[in-house]
Amino acid sequence: MEESQSKQESNTRVAQHGSQQDVDPTFQTKRALEKERSKPRPRPLPRVQLQSLPGWSSTSNDVPLSQLIREMDHESRRCIHRSKKKLDRSEHISQGTIPEIYEKRKETISHTQSMEQKYLFQNFTKLLLLQKCCPGGSEKLVRESWHPCVPEEGGHMIEIQDLFDPNLDTEKKPQLVIIEGAAGIGKSTLARQVKRAWDEGQLYRDRFQHVFFFSCRELAQCKQLSLAELIAQGQEVPTAPTRQILSRPEKLLFILDGIDEPAWVLEDQNPELCVHWSQAQPVHTLLGSLLGKSILPEASLMLTARTTALQKLVPSLGQPHRVEVLGFSEFERKDYFYKYFAKERNTIIDFNLIGSIPVLLTLCEVPWVCWLLCTCLEKQMQQGEVLSLTSQTTTALCLKYLSLTIPGQHLSTQLRTLCSLAAEGICQRRTLFSKSDLCKQGLAEDAIATFLKIGVLQRQPSSLSYSFAHLCLQEFFAAMSYILEDSEEAHGDMGNDRTVETLVERYGRQNLFEAPTVRFLLGLLNTREMREMENIFACKFPWETKLKLLQSIIGEPFCQPCHLGLFHCLYENQEEELLTETMLCFPLTASGPNHMEATVFQTNVKRLVIQTDMELMVVTFCITFSHVRSLRLKGKGQQEYKLTAPAMVLYRWTPISEASWKVLFSNLKCTRNLEELDLSGNPLSYSAVRSLCTALRQPGCRLKTLWLVDCGLTSRCCSFLASMLSAHSRLAELDLRLNDLGDNGVRQLCEGLRNPACNLSILRLDQASLSEQVITELRALETKNPKLFISSTWMSHMTMPTENTDGEESLTSSKQQQQQSGDKHMEPLGTDDDFWGPSGPVSTEVVDRERNLYRVRLPMAGSYHCPSTGLHFVVTRAVTIEIGFCAWSQFLHETPLQHSHMVAGPLFDIKAEHGAVTAVCLPHFVSLQEGKVDSSLFHVAHFQDHGMVLETPARVEPHFAVLENPSFSPMGVLLRMIPAVGHFIPITSITLIYYRLYLEDITFHLYLVPNDCTIRKAIDEEELKFQFVRINKPPPVDALYVGSRYIVSSSKEVEILPKELELCYRSPRESQLFSEIYVGNIGSGINLQLTDKKYMNLIWEALLKPGDLRPALPRMASAPKDAPALLHFVDQHREQLVARVTSVDPLLDKLHGLVLSEEDYETVRAEATNQDKMRKLFRGSRSWSWDCKDHFYQALKETHPHLIMDLLEKSGGVSVRL
């Protein structure tokens, strides 16, 4: 296999595109973006390049900036709102809509205008959304960090339109959806997108008649509100009387954004007290009643909150739908970057230079950091500076932003005041400030104007309040305030203690390290960042302050369980001394056998669930300073090895980006105590292997054991592995099994093994697919180096004869998938399964028939189509593609889509080298000719480790759906069902007819199934078990409908059981419906018919003639003596049998004693290859009688039934006697 990328990046691309371009006009697909980039520009623009970080290579390839990309069209939406009919004031009063509310809105909340404000993320693209499995109570809402046992999977990826889909367990549509995630990850923007999409008629219109959006930080400014006033404030213009709105509460959706921000306690009122909807009550009581279902129990709610705040939010949330926002995929980070600089900016920036800085690219997983990065670049361009970003942390990036935006040191005093305001707001859980708040704090008018101009502060649209540009920015300023205050304290220890007490009081000890303010504070206590603060504030900080404050904050955690929050804090700090001291000082014993959050640094294995690239980066960074000796990144289906304790196993349900791999491997350059690394089951691209081997060559890397089982490695990767073996003297064990290395790859490894600097003692790799020459070379290496042990199950290697340019026969090796069940052989399929390309047919090989695994080697760039399966690949270069036939029942029953979507085609597990396939056409059996099916209902389902995601195809053709630049995993076509349509979906179907002769009687089996190659293959194999042979007849011409029933009839008196067939879809692993037809004498032939039971119209008929019947062992009449001698079946197909028989030894065992003597048996077995054995066998068969050849034929039929059946069908007749 070339660099397999099964399951990698697929969710990212699905999470990038999906069908959301229909939801938000700002969403752009990758295809549309590339089209925009290709448009001619009116004038050349200057090009600026970034200075990359030391130690990271950068590329010189220039990527043109995309042209103007549409942003949110606020003006058009305002025009729509203005065109709406406005109700008369008297009409409002008479119908109970309380029009005075709209007159008071400027005094209460400014939601209408804020929805039209230019937010930081106006250019927002799509977010990765993970639907989580919700536990039974709210006390477990927060994800546990450490697990003493294997954690369950964390859910599956979804899109914005799936937020209110039925729960997996209950299959009920949720009334409460919680949008959770880290700070700045995009929760509020997602909530606004839902509201905007509903306003524009693109989302949830069939479920909700009214959707109300509320910013909780703005709601908190209101002391009291009635339900009617709340509803009025949630509407931009009154759309209906309040009584009418409340008459159908099940059609209402309340979106409460930032429910965790205000300092309120949401307590439900006494349910026995029925408060009228017009009666005012405290806001927190009103919201608590909504959440507690005391009022409007049928209404739906959507809440957004930081994950750490969920546990203390409300006493009980029932069974919510939990969706975690994971930020940007790697593609969306690039897309956001282009969109930011697309409008009104006359400079093109090469994103590849940013992409070449993996740490920075990983930080940009958080959308707020993306905005921060782009703002810094914009400020540098405006100031005429050379673009240079070397920030390793979010804290460093914030300081860079501050140094670029603050016009001079004359504002340092006012900047201190702003920091104090931020800290006061954080302590009081306030994010909105009045003009008097700013003045009381000491901010001057001109300073406020300056902070507004540079974007640190923003004025709310009502002009009555101010806020920081983002809550994370306020938390950063608050962190600076604590350092400024501590440096001014006369008694430093008291100041430090007071700071820690304030933080603990605000966030709680358990969540202290999860708080962004604390993370920023640790980041600012880095030596380099403190110097930067000194430059900004024009002052000097006593270094004792730094040390004492660090001790005050980090001094407590040794009594606390270690978790992701602490890792984030340590990463932000970056101080090696602090990292080493902290990570090595944790206790090595658990506090108790039931301690669910026992630290990882124990003498056993602990497990940690990580969801994002950022989490993977900070964890791997920190553990290199710890006691951990073994690290496993859990992949799919990998074999478990016993790890050396203390060990850590990382679980991740979402794809790992290329940037994340680079960061992970960069952290291995100095591993300290880490000696074992297991990446088995994780697909590694060509560039990822290069990064890994580069890290392993570093002198500071102490890895001794590396497991890379089933990582999709190819011969291209072996040059890096060989170079690493030559340079890395510590690596002692390397496992490369279940990878497609081939002869060339193993030869390169041998070169590395011969190097005197190589100390490898154990090498595990598959040898079944290797040629004799390479196996001999491996044995010679073992003989020459007694310390080297090459471990493998030494099985007979399988080769296929090919013809070289000289016409001589040569051997071509192919991958052997080694399983515990034993040797799996490989054989070519018939020509029906060939791929047809630019140079003609390309044969498909059987890798493992039991596992339905096949392989095709496409020799050059071009388009290749397989008529049998319907698959179509467009490739840019020579590539090897593995194709597995799967059953939907393995995957679909675990998702709610089985009720909302219909299977529309076969399911394939495809693996191919990353970037080699530019398009794949996946077959479907939905008939588009009828004009009854909208192509927008088609989706491609990807089943990955983290769950299932849906991707919208680039286009849908009559027989296939097209994916461009695909990523691969088990994938197939689904059709979204419309309730009104039900089963009235026209499909393309086929009829399959099988027969078996018994004396004079004939038995037929007739199937009517969707045109799905996996179903056809499953039926073929089932019928073959009972020696039934298929007859090829044309399928029904017209489209049929699932669930329809058809009457089976014949032109002769025959026995038919059952006489009706239903057209339905059943998974290939399930039994298929068929009718059995018994015919005593076929005579000149019979006519079979299928008639629609409801309308009694003929939909299919076929004529079966005696010439259609070719039994497996037909009776042949003796030929006249003067007629030319007939060739026996084995002689007719000698060439095919020599080339395609792959298990010769079992064949010889059946012939031993009947046809072969002991000497003949041993002589044939002594040959080196299967082809040589078959040639030797045929040379001896020249003296065999016809009966001996019959025995030979029977042995072939028993050992290679599929091969014999294929030859029989193609030959049209045989010469075999009974």
UniProtKB/Swiss-Prot annotation:
Positions of the CARD domain: 1122-1211
Marked site: Cleavage: F968, S969
One BP annotation, GO: response to muramyl dipeptide
Subcellular locations according to the entry: Cytoplasm, Cytosol; Cytoplasm; Nucleus
EC number: 3.4.-.-
Binding sites annotated in the UniProt record for ATP: G181, A182, A183, G184, I185, G186, K187, S188
Region UPA, residue ranges: 969-1118
Principal localisation: cytoplasm
Function of the molecule: Acts as the sensor component of the Nlrp1a inflammasome, which mediates inflammasome activation in response to various pathogen-associated signals, leading to subsequent pyroptosis. Inflammasomes are supramolecular complexes that assemble in the cytosol in response to pathogens and other damage-associated signals and play critical roles in innate immunity and inflammation.
Annotated protein name in UniProt: NACHT, LRR and PYD domains-containing protein 1a allele 1
